Swiss-Prot record:
CDD domains: EcFpg-like_N. Involved in base excision repair of DNA damaged by oxidation or by mutagenic agents. Acts as a DNA glycosylase that recognizes and removes damaged bases. Has a preference for oxidized purines, such as 7,8-dihydro-8-oxoguanine (8-oxoG). Has AP (apurinic/apyrimidinic) lyase activity and introduces nicks in the DNA strand. Cleaves the DNA backbone by beta-delta elimination to generate a single-strand break at the site of the removed base with both 3'- and 5'-phosphates. It comes from the Bacteria. Pfam families: Fapy_DNA_glyco (PF01149), H2TH (PF06831), zf-FPG_IleRS (PF06827). Its cofactor is Zn(2+). The lineage of its organism: Bacteria, Pseudomonadati, Pseudomonadota, Gammaproteobacteria, Chromatiales. It catalyses: Hydrolysis of DNA containing ring-opened 7-methylguanine residues, releasing 2,6-diamino-4-hydroxy-5-(N-methyl)formamidopyrimidine; 2'-deoxyribonucleotide-(2'-deoxyribose 5'-phosphate)-2'-deoxyribonucleotide-DNA = a 3'-end 2'-deoxyribonucleotide-(2,3-dehydro-2,3-deoxyribose 5'-phosphate)-DNA + a 5'-end 5'-phospho-2'-deoxyribonucleoside-DNA + H(+). This is Formamidopyrimidine-DNA glycosylase. The keyword Thylakoid does not apply.
Length: 271
């Protein structure tokens, strides 16, 4: 599933092709995504100029003078900038054609993504209203994380993956951040000290920043706006390295299951 670094990579990649461009046509080949694509989407967009491309958690928001276009990449979706005559692939569901002669094309094999229209303030939309702070923003700091963990028995990895606590810390990045912080993923969140929370905030920021700089992580489906892959998978320290030597101490990396997801950690470095 595209996580925060992949979505931010997509945002940066498409913004220069989208902002300031007028929509000349909208092609909806498959309206049955996670939620139905609005039937009047073409009417709402055609002839209008697109503004900034924003990101909130894993949602992309494209400004239009009459509202906001919300996009979500689901489990395996991607957005590519193509020419109108670019060969269609199976699961290319929606094109936004622009006056530049380019199209923004949504590819979504599992159809778990979303293309929705927002009128009114974005923060009040049901999909956005209950989200926690951005991990790279000023509201996510040591004091906030420490307060959020008090009296919580849930494992710290599951705690930081809860989008009500903080957004965008997906499975890969949670394992990597906890490794760098030296914190075992199964520890109860409420047992962390303030110093450990401060360290974890910094490693979450570090890992996400590194992943964005590398264009995200491509394990299966994710591609960037030009069809290229992300490269952060080449820099993973523990994720997917079961039985291999820890890069810090050479102890074999362990794999466990938490909340139906694989977790990777070093039993010597993380406590």
């Amino acid at each position: 599933m595209p996580e925060l670094p992949e979505v931010e990579t997509t945002r940066r990649g498409i913004e220069r092709h989208v902002t300031g461009r007028r929509v000349t046509s909208v092609i909806v080949r498959e309206p049955r995504l996670r939620w139905p694509v609005p039937g009047d989407l073409a009417e709402r967009l055609t002839g209008h100029t697109l503004g900034r491309v924003l990101r909130r958690a894993k949602y992309l928001l494209i400004e239009v003078d009459t509202g906001l276009l919300l996009l979500h990449l689901g489990m395996s979706g991607s957005l590519r900038v193509v020419t109108p005559d670019a060969p269609l692939r199976k699961h290319d569901h929606i094109d936004l054609c622009l006056d530049s002669g380019r199209c923004l094309r949504l590819h979504d094999p599992r159809r778990f993504g979303a293309v929705l229209w927002i009128e009114g303030p974005a923060h009040a939309h049901p999909l956005l209203a209950e989200l926690g702070p951005e991990p790279l923003g000023k509201d996510f700091d040591a004091d906030y994380l420490f307060r959020s963990t008090r009296k919580r028995r849930v494992a710290i990895k599951q705690h930081i993956m809860n989008s009500h606590v903080v957004v965008g810390v997906g499975n890969i990045y949670a394992s990597e951040a906890l490794f760098l912080a030296g914190i075992r993923p199964g520890r109860a969140a409420g047992r962390l000290t303030r110093a450990e929370c401060a360290r974890l905030v910094e490693t979450i920021r570090q890992v996400l920043g590194e992943a964005i700089a590398q264009g995200g992580t491509t394990l299966r489906d994710f591609v960037r706006e030009d069809g290229s892959h992300g490269y952060f998978q080449q820099h993973l320290r523990v994720y997917g390295r079961t039985g291999l030597a820890c890069m810090a101490c050479e102890t074999p990396v362990k794999q466990i299951v938490q909340g139906n997801r694989s977790t990777y950690y070093c039993p010597a470095c993380q406590r």
